[in-house]
Amino acid sequence: MPTGLVIMHWDERVGVEVLGAYPEEVVIQEKTLMQLYSQHEFTGEAGMVSLTAGAVNLASYYTGPESAVYVILILTAEEDGDVYEEGLAEITRQILMNLESDSLNSILPPLFQRLSVYPTLTEEQRYGMLLNSDVKRMLLNRLREETAISKSEISIWMKDQYREGFVDVENLLAGMVKLGLVKIASVKGLSSDLVFLTEDIMVLRTPPVELIKDPVDHHLPASLKDSYIKEVRNFFELYVPSEADNLAIIDKVLLDPACYEVIKLMREAMVTRNDLEKLRKKGVDDVDRVLKAMWETKMIAVFQDDKNNEYFCLTSDFFIERFYPRYNIDNIRQQYRTRSQNPNALLKALDMMKDEYYAQVKLKKAAAKKKEEVAAD
């Protein structure tokens, strides 16, 4: 696990400046900071370098010469800094946005907490982290409309959108490729590589199906069964999906390590306060804070039996998963009719969609075969 975070700035006149640290007592020797500075100077570009200093490893993310800020993560000797690169790039943007305010030190603890669990994030959390980034969400929305965009155009567009901020386009695209959402390819007749949308993400609330099927079997007293089912039904009769609602759940619950531990437990059963207190060993130090976050996002309800025992129940679960964007075919057809996209780019987009479709069919067949084999055993 990481042990600390240091924010450094390089000033040509005064040299190294430490702008913030978490925990506050964390210190990196100036000699080591100069070594990091030299390594970044050697590459000359924004990005990450790693350095071993005594008994620790350091992963340093540099924003480039314009802002000259270094976000340095302190790791144990056994940890590999490369697994934190995408997470470092994401929190670096948020740190730069708060450099000129008094809020820098107050945002470091939650950013450090999220970064610390980055290597262990589940698939749904990784999708959530992507959507929680305004930059990645903006690019995804544009790709949904245009199907393909050149890398050079993305770079220019991002610089125009975030003139005062920092966007590492290469890192941004690498993260989306890793999640299987986009592919990058060259197209005959075009000088810049194109970024193609190959998968999309669906996000919405869903009823906790397994809990509803048999609440009693999931540790809810029989006397509370009807009340629980009625609560879930009432919520979804009025539920209207919205981006604001999705982002609130992602930010307050899905990407909060303590809240996510509680969600995982509540997906399995109805719980009491004692059940939640047992999660302290998994990092749930403040049960009241977690319950407040889940109550405010309308994900839970509390029921009381005739002995005044309280049961905390999941009334709304959250679905976030990739899906094949069939709507892209209509987009491609429309762009061909209006000649708003290069014909070779549209043909490449169709080829990629075809490849993605058959790849998914193959995966589904393999999964079905494996299921049959397990059932036969």
Regions found by a protein language model. Give the residues of each.
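Acidic, low-complexity cytosolic segments
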Residues: 2-3, 10-131
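Short amphipathic alpha-helical interaction segments
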Residues: 162-178, 281-297
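Short, amphipathic alpha-helical interaction segments positioned at domain boundaries
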Residues: 197-235, 243-246, 313-352
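Minor-groove-contacting beta-hairpin "wing" of winged helix-turn-helix DNA-binding domains
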Residues: 189-198, 307-315
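A short, conserved structural fragment
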Residues: 177-188, 295-307
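Short amphipathic alpha-helical interface segments
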Residues: 122-162, 221-283, 339-354, 361-364
